[in-house]
Amino acid sequence: MNGSTSSDAVDPGLCVTTPSPVKQTLTLGSDTFNKDDKQITPSIRRSNSTRSKGINFNVAISPLATGQTPPSSKGGHRKTASYDAKNLHLPQLAESSPSSTIPDSPIPTASEELKYDLPLPSTEQLMGLDIDDQLRLLALKEMSIVEIKDSIGNLTSKLQRNENELHSLREVIQRSLYKELNSSSSKSKKETSSNGFVTRPQRQNSNPREEAIASTKNRSRRRTLSSSSSGVPPVLSSQQLSQNTDKQSRRDSTLWSNLSKPLNLIQQFDSMLQHEFEKSMIPQKNQEGSDKTMDSHKSRHSEDSTSSLGSISSPLNSKSKSVTGKQSNDELDRYFAQQSTSGASKDKPDGVVPTESHMNSDDMIQAVSSSIWSFVNDVKTNVLSSLADEDVPESRSHVTKGPSGFSNSNDQKEINDLTVYNLDTGSTVSLDKNEDSDLDYTFVHNTANEDRAAVDHDKSKND
């Protein structure tokens, strides 16, 4: 260039040098604004340096802050386009020059470990900042979070790598120890096999005579210990065997004694069932004991009559009473059969006697049920006698009666009105004197009704 360029063609902030012998440098500063008229007046600075050649760009590269140019010689005040000079300036990054940072900034610089880890200023200062500065702080905070996450990931990977290395190191050490132990054990085995005996560590300053004496003492001790240990167990074992045999024999005896009673009960039950079924299948042809059965029934006690009419006796019957119950049931069956046959013979002129098939089925059910209840009574008495060590008390063998010798007549009347439960037969017995006559009357009335029903049944069949 032979001449100086105009201010319209050159941007502000550029330095232009001319190749003339008297080298003059034109320095165009940034535009300044007057507070009154706000006219743009470029500032020009001349320098007589002979070394500078070419074009120099005095532009500071920074994403956060703009480089500050020195004020003009005229004393114009500098004001940026984004924010006022009174506002706070953010710190520059590593790319910016250190001379352009403001040392009096309230925001501290980034730490050495993390580049973007900057603490935020107070809320008042944040409110005083421009929106662009607030957005820059937001971006810095996000970058710091990302940086911290990256550091955490790096630390976790480093920790995992160190753990893997520790595990591999342990495996190597275990293998080496195993090899050493195997080698030492193999060497000791080879030495013992070559020598034929186990090598023992020799004592220092030992005398062979003393060693021989010690070995003989040890042998004698071992012999005494072995003899004592071998002699004691046989005595104990024999005692234990005798005790075990006694216990086993006792257990066997008690077991067989407990099993014998149920077996006997089962046999009795089988025989009773067989007898009942045979009796029900075989027809009754003997009619000789009709008068005897009637007399025995009239002379019977009220307890037997109530037990026979009840058709089911209590499970508390004893063995003796169960036998009498069986006999009474058999007599009743015979009596009913005789009554039915006598009524049929009166109606029929031919004198044909009906067989057992004409009997009522209720009588058969009554006989079977009475036999079953008697068997249940036997089972119960046998079980109770087997479980209890003592004999059955005498209070169950007789009928409970009211106390005698009451002086007061009212008490005597109350006792007569009460009923007593018989433990042997399982029937309720009233203490009233007129009970026997009433029971006999009811029984005769029932038998007469049954005879009439049988006669009507035969008539309907004949018709």
From Swiss-Prot:
Residues 17-32, 40-55 have a biased composition (Polar residues). Residues 1-110, 180-255, 281-358, 388-413 are annotated as: Disordered. It is found in: Cytoplasm. Keywords: Coiled coil, Cytoplasm. GO terms for cellular component: cytoplasm. Residues 96-110, 225-238, 305-322 have a biased composition (Low complexity). It comes from the Eukaryota. Residues 288-304 have a biased composition (Basic and acidic residues). Signal peptide: none annotated. Residues 145-177 form a coiled coil. Its main location: cytoplasm. Belongs to the TDA11 family. This is Topoisomerase I damage affected protein 11. It comes from Debaryomyces hansenii (strain ATCC 36239 / CBS 767 / BCRC 21394 / JCM 1990 / NBRC 0083 / IGC 2968) (Yeast).
